[in-house]
């Protein structure tokens, strides 16, 4: 199987990273077992969820313009950026009806995942920061590096329990 091809049937897809050298993001295709239970059935309403991580970035305004052109909504998992342009992007995401999700304030794995206390501090900072700017009480979180990352010094179950206790849904 070459880069960019998708498997069919009950084959197992392996991790492949797709990186656009001119972009500030990458897509990792994780292990996915495909079987009949996760395939669309005739008559199903098909859905696609668009999510964007690590923003706002230099591409966010263009992404929002394109989404508006096609009347499409997306979820933006953002990090804490204090510059005026980023603050305007947070507001624009919300004002245009998209979902604003948290992706940590600092995005510094070595700090966030060092302890539950550090994770809680970073989480509280991004949640309060986004609320102060947008008035939105964010309830969605995407772990930097994913919920099964290899850099955490703390059992990820502790972080997940904390998010559950905060009524926050996490997504990978």
Model-predicted segments: where are they?
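His/Asp/Glu-enriched short active-site or ligand-binding loop at hydrolase and phosphoryl-transfer sites
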Residues: 156-172
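Short, internal active-site loops enriched in acidic
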Residues: 145-150
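Low-complexity, acidic Ser/Thr/Pro-rich repeat tracts that form intrinsically disordered stalk/linker regions
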Residues: 8-26, 30
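Active-site beta->alpha N-cap acidic-glycine motif
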Residues: 22-143
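Short, well-ordered secondary-structure micro-motifs
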Residues: 112-113, 151-154
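Charged helix-capping and loop-helix junction motifs
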Residues: 119-123, 153-160
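Sec-dependent signal peptide cleavage junction
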Residues: 1-8
């Amino acid at each position: 199987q070459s880069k960019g091809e998708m498997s069919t049937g009950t084959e197992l897809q392996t991790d492949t990273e797709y990186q656009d050298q001119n972009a500030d993001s990458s897509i990792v295709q994780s292990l996915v077992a495909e079987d009949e239970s996760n395939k669309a059935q005739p008559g199903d309403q098909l859905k696609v969820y668009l999510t964007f991580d690590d923003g706002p970035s230099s591409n966010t305004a263009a992404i929002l313009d394109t989404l508006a052109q096609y009347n499409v909504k997306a979820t933006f998992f953002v990090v804490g950026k204090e510059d005026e342009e980023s603050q305007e992007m947070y507001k624009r995401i919300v004002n245009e009806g998209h979902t604003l999700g948290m992706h940590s304030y600092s995005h510094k794995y070595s700090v966030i995942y060092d302890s539950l206390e550090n994770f809680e501090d970073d989480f509280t900072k991004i949640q309060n920061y986004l609320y102060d700017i947008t008035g939105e009480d964010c309830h969605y979180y995407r772990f930097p590096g994913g919920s099964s990352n290899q850099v955490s010094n703390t059992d990820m179950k502790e972080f997940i329990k904390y998010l559950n206790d905060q009524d926050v849904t996490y997504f990978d």
